[in-house]
């Protein structure tokens, strides 16, 4: 089998061959129950669930591919709600003609991330559509996790809280911009795509009170902060010079006229907690090499009008607006 055919979606021999020869070598060990339409699992306590669809182009990019992204993306959405990711449901929409070697490469990435995340697969589905109906491969995932750090909400921001960022921003969006065919900038910049739970677990197990937590994906830092300000009816002030930014990312943004605060991340989170707890939180985060750039970038203030303010090194302030329009389609 060199490529996916429409017959691979007929539910018969060709479908079974696709599943057994292509999917199962990579995913079999993670599947909870075979030959069942709806596997069962036992649960007690509070759980969180997140569904996401992945349509990124190109399928393989610097620092990852759609396989790595779909596992990390769904698991991260559960993690930033204080949950430990446990189960994943996956649906694959395959375009007729999709090369089997490419599909296997993506499945291998999924396998690698499932190992890292210690995730099990509850259900798995494949559909094949005629050529041109989708662009090679779309993946839908639903992640289920158990809440181990309750009380996290975008409505819990109050005056006196600090805003922490876990790493340099905008690397995913900037790297995707640079490698798109219409731009083609030469760069070694990679996406920051990664699992966040290993970074967050020590915080969750500490006695720190986390008020708000979000992964800064589509819309970037600007989107997260504006959503928080509107949900909690507060003013958030961010100091521009404190926001960690790679020189290469900064250069791409300057060349293309982009604002890094609005670009997507796939392995960066934003955290709000009491100012007195910020040093301990940073100490915990920086014990992991992947969070060595974590820092306080601003704070929360009372205001009759929800807003996000960006203050530069000279003390001048401007409103950091919610991103508008489509900067770059299909980044995740």
Predicted regions: what is each one?
Residues 30-35, 118-124, 207-216, 237-240, ...:
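Flexible, glycine/charged-enriched surface loops at secondary-structure junctions
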Residues 5, 13-165, 171:
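Glycine-rich phosphate/pyrophosphate-binding loop regions near the starts of catalytic domains
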Residues 272-279:
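Helix N-cap motif at beta-to-alpha junctions
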Residues 1-22, 320-328:
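N-terminal amphipathic/basic leader segments beginning at the initiator methionine
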Residues 31-33, 40-44, 114-115, 130-136, ...:
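Solvent-exposed alpha-helices and their adjacent loops that cap or buttress functional pockets
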Residues 95-97, 189-265:
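Active-site-proximal betaalpha loop/short-helix elements
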Residues 146-192, 311, 330-332:
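Phosphate/diphosphate-binding glycine-rich loops and adjacent basic-rich segments that engage nucleotide
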Residues 287-332:
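Acidic, Ser/Thr/Pro-rich beta/coil linker or hinge segments at domain junctions
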């Amino acid at each position: 089998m060199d490529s996916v055919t429409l017959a691979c979606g007929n539910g018969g021999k060709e479908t079974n061959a696709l599943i057994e020869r292509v999917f199962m070598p990579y995913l079999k060990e993670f599947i909870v129950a075979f030959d069942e339409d709806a596997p069962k699992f036992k649960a007690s306590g509070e759980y969180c669930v997140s569904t996401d669809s992945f349509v990124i182009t190109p399928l393989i990019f610097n620092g990852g591919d759609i396989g790595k992204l779909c596992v990390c993306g769904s698991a991260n959405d559960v993690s930033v709600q204080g949950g430990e990711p446990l189960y994943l449901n996956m649906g694959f929409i395959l375009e007729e003609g999709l090369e089997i070697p490419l599909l296997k490469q993506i499945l291998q990435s999924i396998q690698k991330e499932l190992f890292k995340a210690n995730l099990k697969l509850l259900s798995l589905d494949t559909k094949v559509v005629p050529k041109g109906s989708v662009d090679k491969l779309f993946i839908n995932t639903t992640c289920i996790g158990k809440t181990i750090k309750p009380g996290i909400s975008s409505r819990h921001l109050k005056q006196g809280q600090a805003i922490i960022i876990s790493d340099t921003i905008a690397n995913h969006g900037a790297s995707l911009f640079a490698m798109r065919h219409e731009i083609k900038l030469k760069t070694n910049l990679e996406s920051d795509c990664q699992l966040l739970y290993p970074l967050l677990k020590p915080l969750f197990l500490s006695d720190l009170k986390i008020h708000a937590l979000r992964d800064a994906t589509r819309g970037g830092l600007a989107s997260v902060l504006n959503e928080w300000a509107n949900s909690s009816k507060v003013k958030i002030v961010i100091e521009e010079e404190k926001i960690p930014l790679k020189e290469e990312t900064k250069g791409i943004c300057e060349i293309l006229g982009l604002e890094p605060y609005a670009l997507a991340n796939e392995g960066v989170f934003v955290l709000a907690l009491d100012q007195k707890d910020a040093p301990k939180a940073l100490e915990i985060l920086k014990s992991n090499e992947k969070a060595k750039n974590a820092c306080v970038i601003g704070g929360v203030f009372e205001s009759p009008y929800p807003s996000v303010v960006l203050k530069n090194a000279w003390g001048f302030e401007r409103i950091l607006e919610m991103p508008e329009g489509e900067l770059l389609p299909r980044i995740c």
